[in-house]
């Protein structure tokens, strides 16, 4: 359905406002540092690091900050934190499933902040596995239209493992298995098509349709979670119509 993104309403990637710019930069920097630590500091041999750097550049993170994060992660420069990835599960109002991915150097602080945000905004924590089974790990690549058609994108990425191409109005989203993420991104580059981001995330198998009131409650909870410096990403299985999402974001 044109203009409607299952991925975007799942992940709730709203337009970044100035007040959140610092938090966004910090999250992107942490991604670079962790990617360099896990897979090495050479982007040419570490696709995850390459994509993290490209995403940071697209978001206008200064090159000096990017390079310092890469060096810290690779051990070329002192000062890197011991980042740990932790996933919490829970329910938002209206029975909406929530996955919260944290990247933190303090597990107790992260757990406390997530719990407080959930409790104060009508959410409840859930046991591990009780929510995650509703989601599948997927790769998603986004690119601007720039005069391209859906057929142009399909022709470039179909043989690379793309499962689905969604028309979002001004851009396209390409869904694939996480293991095909590099192949899909590379296929776009080989076809001369610029991409905005390439990352792995979660896509729901079942969604919960929401009206305006329900959508506001869920988005309020998501905003509270994303206010934590330890929270990297929040995914839900909420199905929010485009017109309602637009009203909330105004």
UniProtKB/Swiss-Prot annotation:
InterPro entries: Integrase-like_N, TACO1_YebC-like_2nd/3rd_dom, TACO1_YebC_N, Transcrip_reg_TACO1-like, Transcrip_reg_TACO1-like_dom3, YebC-like. PANTHER family: TRANSCRIPTIONAL REGULATORY PROTEIN YEBC-RELATED (PTHR12532:SF6), TRANSLATIONAL ACTIVATOR OF CYTOCHROME C OXIDASE 1 (PTHR12532). The keyword DNA-binding applies. It comes from Mycobacterium avium (strain 104). GO terms for biological process: regulation of DNA-templated transcription. One of its GO terms (cellular component) is cytosol. GO terms for molecular function: DNA binding. It comes from the Bacteria. This is Probable transcriptional regulatory protein MAV_3481. SUPFAM superfamilies: YebC-like. Belongs to the TACO1 family. Its main location: cytoplasm.
